[in-house]
Amino acid sequence: MMPETQLHVIARQMFERHGATAVAQAAQNARACESKGDAEQAKEWRHIEDAIKIMRGPHQS
């Protein structure tokens, strides 16, 4: 598993690059890894997805 700091760097870069669609992009990457049978890589993408959600903050209505 990649270091926590590296996961957060990737999450921040994805959030800056993809904005509102960053969470969906990370989830799509996780599903692609799962479909290939790469559970460890999928777990890292899920972790990145969670970090992006924290950066994004709560939804406002």
Annotate each predicted stretch with a short phrase.
Residues M1-Q28, A32, K36, E40-K43, ...:
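Long, non-catalytic architectural segments outside compact domain cores
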